[in-house]
Amino acid sequence: MAALSWQGIVAVTFTALAFVVMAADWVGPDITFTVLLAFLTAFDGQIVTVAKAAAGYGNTGLLTVVFLYWVAEGITQTGGLELIMNYVLGRSRSVHWALVRSMFPVMVLSAFLNNTPCVTFMIPILISWGRRCGVPIKKLLIPLSYAAVLGGTCTSIGTSTNLVIVGLQDARYAKSKQVDQAKFQIFDIAPYGVPYALWGFVFILLAQGFLLPGNSSRYAKDLLLAVRVLPSSSVVKKKLKDSGLLQQNGFDVTAIYRNGQLIKISDPSIVLDGGDILYVSGELDVVEFVGEEYGLALVNQEQELAAERPFGSGEEAVFSANGAAPYHKLVQAKLSKTSDLIGRTVREVSWQGRFGLIPVAIQRGNGREDGRLSDVVLAAGDVLLLDTTPFYDEDREDIKTNFDGKLHAVKDGAAKEFVIGVKVKKSAEVVGKTVSAAGLRGIPGLFVLSVDHADGTSVDSSDYLYKIQPDDTIWIAADVAAVGFLSKFPGLELVQQEQVDKTGTSILYRHLVQAAVSHKGPLVGKTVRDVRFRTLYNAAVVAVHRENARIPLKVQDIVLQGGDVLLISCHTNWADEHRHDKSFVLVQPVPDSSPPKRSRMIIGVLLATGMVLTQIIGGLKNKEYIHLWPCAVLTAALMLLTGCMNADQTRKAIMWDVYLTIAAAFGVSAALEGTGVAAKFANAIISIGKGAGGTGAALIAIYIATALLSELLTNNAAGAIMYPIAAIAGDALKITPKDTSVAIMLGASAGFVNPFSYQTNLMVYAAGNYSVREFAIVGAPFQVWLMIVAGFILVYRNQWHQVWIVSWICTAGIVLLPALYFLLPTRIQIKIDGFFERIAAVLNPKAALERRRSLRRQVSHTRTDDSGSSGSPLPAPKIVA
């Protein structure tokens, strides 16, 4: 075959450079592809004409993608899906059943709705549900993204990629004799996509024990931390072995400090008391979560030292919860080899004076025995977690000379925090449940302060056994994101809801705004009630944030100060109208803060269902009654008319970066096809097919090439670039156009290893605080597994009925596997556990080591119990100051 022309060389060279730019994340794919396309059209039409380059912007598949965002926004704004999913999820204590309950409904849902909004509204639901059920969040969020992707492969409208390929195929074969064979109906991909999704689901269920991460952090692990037992904690007066603390993974109690003595844990029968300081080895995220569940407060080194003093500020003052958070802003630092702190104990260092920092935890090891944080002798390479004070400056010379590199931010406890009250409705599901069981503990950015009864009495937040009653008012410290979560929580309404309703603003145009009070403005020194805020501004103050303080007053009684940040419920135009108001120095709308229009929930769901039914009926009768593009537009228009969403929300729902990426990628693929580059790559696939003696091998090659490209680019771009290559190869090998397109659809959705390869991956990556390594540990074997699955499906595509039957039977068996497992003899269970432990040791050695340590600790505690120990601790040495 002739060599590439200069046009082909230019096209492939600059396309490859664009791939490098996108893979390195230097510039986004929307800008990269748009600039690349403009460059390729600059050669007077010799590479690609302007008409062909612009054709993608009006492609019907792309237009369908764009306007389905409108429909998804309409459903999301009604809150209907959240209500349904909360009901479907129910309650589960095991990771296996939690995954079954969470993944399967999402797979079904994402088959008919765009997976991005599905994941958007499911993330806070799953976080709350996981905390409520005691299931690690990290076990749920990666499977959530994968479930949304897998479900999208079951119908032609399930993902934007599918719609893009459908649009490209319609355009390519519009005037061909194969037009009928090429026309996609909604379920034409189902014979391949459903088994593909089921086997992906099976893999996650089988691998969750040794591949999915638990509650872990991206930062230092195996830390020595201190927590204080609050007087009202559920563990007070309980033996350590009966408290539930020993059963918590990643939370290992090593010692107790009580009455001036450090007691090493040699006997789990020791009885815990209020005020005890427990020394724990584990990870910060896990310790914080367990602390919230059991009533334990994180202790820094200054509080640890204060607890030694019998008089002074007083224990309750030291551990009071009046501060805005248990810490201000945590940073991680590594002690340099040249540090003058080496050889000194933590207590001997003037941390605040020299660095503006307070030690919170130190990584264990360096040959030291576990003890108190203050008594740890510092060594080179020690990793510390430190809380920042107002005097902290990362550019201090002392910090640069004593620590390696830059101090890394770990957690921000100083994000704007508002004290907000929510009232419990009589019919709320949370009635009769503890705060934890109701799903209000462990939510990022949310902390329950107290509960007020209707009779005027109050319950402190540390009463972990209290069960919520109708008409209770729950006072919560929450950041802006958590306030949005509360506004959509079923059965709860804001205490200020009456004031909000009196503004007269329709719920359709209501949202939240943050406004900072001017130091010289007319609001300073007055209460919200005094200034008649609602009357003057036609808006209601929902909550107030004050730097470094929680204001224990109702909103209308707070005396405002300069710098206070008001959280205001108002009309969508309010921020623009008051941006230059002298009362405020900054006015900023809160994104996605519109309350759910629950009264329109049924209308929104019915309209979306009707849209899907038009496609299903058309597919069953092999007749297109209405194209999905105008159908989506009309559905969204009806949602607008019926008040499911407003016009601004409709406009903002469209993800223009996705539109630009896909449209420009169409033009680039046209350039690759027109210059012969696509044919060159297609010939390689044709050779594979002929060499392997069948079309199945060619389809597998198409799938693998698209999947690998999807890890580097966005899924839509990968599909658009691969389509002309695959279509040429398919036509040459006499493969039906639908089979070729299905291979691309499945491959383009297979971005599982890289968290940046797929939008839903990126969303759960941030929400779950995963590391790239954790994603790759799950995603790499998952990718290989699905390559094998896709190979079988594509090779045996003509026997899809048998593939379906086998897939469903195997899936049912795996779902019921835990029940079958416990019917096996113990010796067989031990062998099975050992087999999976060996696999885990190879794939994730650190996690396997931690599990073995945990098991040894539990066995050790059990043996101690059986020895008949009295429960009295051995005499412990006094702490040497």
Swiss-Prot record:
Disulphide bridges, residue numbers: none
Effect of inactivating the gene: No effect on sulfate uptake, due to the redundancy with SLT2 and SULTR2. Slt1 and slt2, as well as slt1 and sultr2 double mutants show a 50% decline in uptake while the slt1, slt2 and sultr2 triple mutant exhibits no increase in sulfate uptake capacity when deprived of sulfur.
Gene3D superfamilies: Regulator of K+ conductance, C-terminal domain (3.30.70.1450)
One MF term in the entry's GO annotations: sulfate transmembrane transporter activity
Keywords associated with the record: Cell membrane, Membrane, Repeat, Stress response, Sulfate transport, Symport, Transmembrane, Transmembrane helix, Transport
Pfam families linked to this entry: CitMHS, TrkA_C
Induction: Up-regulated by sulfur deprivation.
GO cellular component entries: plasma membrane
Domain RCK C-terminal, first and last residues per copy: 212-296, 318-402, 407-492, 498-584
Membrane topology of the entry: Multi-pass membrane protein
Transmembrane segments: 8-28, 31-51, 61-81, 107-127, 140-160, 186-206, 601-621, 625-645, 658-678, 684-704, 775-795, 803-823
Disordered: annotated segments: 854-881
Localization of this protein: Cell membrane
SUPFAM superfamilies xref list: TrkA C-terminal domain-like (SSF116726)
One example of a Gene Ontology biological process annotation: potassium ion transport
Family to which this protein belongs: Belongs to the divalent anion:Na+ symporter (DASS) superfamily. Na+/sulfate symporter (TC 2.A.47.4) family.
Function per UniProt: Na(+)/sulfate cotransporter with a probable high-affinity for sulfate and a proteasome dependent turnover.
Protein name (database record): Sodium/sulfate cotransporter 1
Organism expressing this protein natively: Chlamydomonas reinhardtii
